[in-house]
């Protein structure tokens, strides 16, 4: 077998491997990644060679194809668990994204699947040319309406058992142009043919990338040249028979080598690599968790197997003698479910405290005993509260000691509160439980007899430590209802997912006797709830409860917010006061409200379920679905939208005369023949649904697996997606359907399927039931149909998100007929051209034509003509025909099949004696006429150009707007056609600021993300020139810590200034987003001291550079520092900060806006701005970093700040401010300017604490700084002069002078 035939894609793969460098030497391991919402999140994969865990890429609804252009992660070679892709819009192939992904190991699977590609609306091919192995698990590719090249993949080459794969609901193979390289005249050598699923075909991932088929024995991998790799290699290699040159390892990886077993002194970890004992000892299953890994039988494990434990400081697992002692460090652990006890299995010594809060469940004791039954010692306290599911505490059958190292409220070692069904303390009395310190507390345990508590006092040795009130006889063991006072609700407010309540203040005789309130609530479709708070008839807890602390003010009414609740659901609620009676002779006191019923507000429903469709004619589609799982109101109608989809134009590329043509169909969905779901009775509320299957009859295994997967996947979606309210309101649907359809398409992103789909109108209808008939459709055309559920509150909450289905109408039997007659024209001696018109409205696309022609007295010949061949001449050229009389007829073949034959046309071929001289006569006539026309056009063009160039530009004030004010394009000029605008970033003082892409701006980069500053359309020529001159100041700056100017577009409108894009915005916004209570918190921790010093160093470095360039900033503040994607802080802005933070400025004496809270005293007094005054501002920026961007001098007005600073005041010290930063601030705020340090001196003090990367890119470590370091003099600006650094901000100077 020839190597070139095996490897037509070898050059591509070779380049990919070269881009990896030494495959295993540079391994970078990343943990599991969940990448969603934004395409930029994919950058987290940038340095990953292996994803140790799973990789999920999902829910990118706003993405477009352009967002993925140039995005590639060639370093990624393997994923150890599974790869999941779900609803990523705009992504057409994984070919460029993961060109070298070679192995999916499947160590942990997603419900049995290692590769899941689900509902990817724009994916056209999988395109993983390097993928060579899916070691474990099946493949699920489902509901991807544009996905092709599935029939050309031999999954048997990738998987040991491909029979479990689930590949359904994708684009029909008959509609796909699944042509492999080298087939039907395609470029390259043909791919290898294999047999899979009984079908022999060429194997490829795309039309330009073959599937890898190695000519090696025993399934070995191979190089791009077909040479066999080492037996330990998997997925390919760069050198044959070299275990160091593998793309991935078949068994184990260690220090760049693939090995069958781990070397001595190393241990297997995560089934694919070897680690040292030292590294294993540092691993944690949960980062930051105390429990360390252990080594057992050559493997590094998260915990030792049963019967084994770690002894002391040893990392190795040893067999226990008898019962394994197991120490578990838990801190203070709350157990609110059986699952929460699973990490205590086998624990005998609990170092910490346990809080049991088991409110729901039935017959939990066996499972709790299995998980907690070995516990002998608790070093802290044991608190059992609100555990309505507990009847006994016997599951602590071995508990012998509660040591009391920490106690509840500093007093109680055992605390048992409000356990409505607790009856027994188990074997504690018999086992001799000891409580050496602290008290015990029992209250509100109505079924727990007092004698059990008194016995426990004796055994534990706590008798006499606690008062009678701490074991209250009236709240323990008292089944009878106590005499209580009625509480009255005074306020309630309902929302979609919450209820706000307030009730009257209850005051017992002794105010200190009132401890708290408990609010009980539950769903109650009928107003028949009782106050019983134990398990219901089904054994589950009926009431939810919430502790409410007493208000601090005695006049304030207590209240609570119940959340999260279900929309449009009736809840029963009552409140009970928890009291403690200290006086022995005092009557029992208590208070409780009656049960009230409240209904939450409606919300948008969830999506309709199980939508199906079929076609019963060429112009109709039938659609049916089931109601949403959560209606969140009364469903009043369904909004149905449908749009015609464009046919795949790529089908024209193939020559269907040479390729077997399998045509798409519009088969009837048999599910329509089943019973109408509308006729099935819904279960009555409050009753259990009946089982349709006979008792004991289970679903078939395959169907059960399918149901399980669908339920689990839908649960995953339910928890993973928060569907926002629809941005449109249903009440406006009938006002202007066309406008509303456009709005749907623009705002909700619906129906963005093909390149030309926007040319087709979106239709809509409202239907009252779960079915719709769509009429007036085009024959044999695919439609996307979206269904939204709308309830009675749709006018305020909107309808649900859409569920969608794709369906094709049936063909029209006459649509593929060729209109008119076939005509012919003789060309040459033995050739004719047959012309005919295409069917004006065919069934889908016309793929080919068939011409049946015959010479009189001979057999007919059938000629196939592809659509491309027809398009060249509008017919077919029949050549080399012998003389004689002929007849011919034509028929078209569309996606729906063959059309009807045309009527025959007769033509003849003349003999050799007849020659056509007409062509020469025509040529002699046309040539002179054409020459005269060319001369006339040239003359017109000359006069028009001369007139255009004579236009004069005048100035009303030529003395003021002189030549010196004109902007002259230079080497910074960028052609406008290289710029693409993506989205708005904000409004600057000159005009709008956009995010964009610039092509060819940087060497080696196809496109560069940039920020584009513009001038308003109504700006004068002077304003445009001033805008460009301000930007020109930045041309002199080239420092890593100053935002760079990248180019200028001065020719044409609008004028653009191209700046470096700082994706995380200004430092002030970034710091505020890191506050714990911030709504836009990105999930990042608050900055540590090292992070703060790094920010300070980067700002100081940028300011040192400006000082060396003799520039004074005059407005240094966090709002004027920008943060890049990698969190680097730079000096500069996008001209937006004054608009966003205008309150940070103050107008003094009718002049311009001044940033008084950041200004030095000499600047406030005399208007003097120097590098020393910038240092003062730097100190304020440090204060902003420490406080996460609080406003300086909070509580003082701008006038008060002016007086305070000029009188010698400085910002107050923060309690939690690091001493190092506080000292730096004090030095920056010296009132004598020359006593303040320079920026270089500041860097001298903190250089040792900056990250190593700072040395590589900073001005401070550059030769330019070292030369000028000793001679840096403060740069001064005269009072009220224009700002020296015009380019640093896009608004006017602080003193209000326009600068000219």
UniProtKB/Swiss-Prot annotation:
Residues 943-1300 are cytoplasmic. Residues 1270-1300 are annotated as: Disordered. Residues 979-1254 form the Protein kinase domain. Autophosphorylated on tyrosine residues between pH 7.9 and pH 10.5. Expressed preferentially in the kidney. Also found in stomach and thymus but not in skeletal muscle, brain, intestine, and uterus. The active site is at residue 1115. GO terms for cellular component: axon; insulin receptor complex; plasma membrane; receptor complex. The keyword Repeat applies. ATP binds at residues 985-993, 1013. One of its GO terms (molecular function) is insulin receptor activity. Receptor with tyrosine-protein kinase activity. Functions as a pH sensing receptor which is activated by increased extracellular pH. Activates an intracellular signaling pathway that involves IRS1 and AKT1/PKB. The extracellular domain is required for sensing alterations in external pH. This is Insulin receptor-related protein. It comes from Rattus norvegicus.
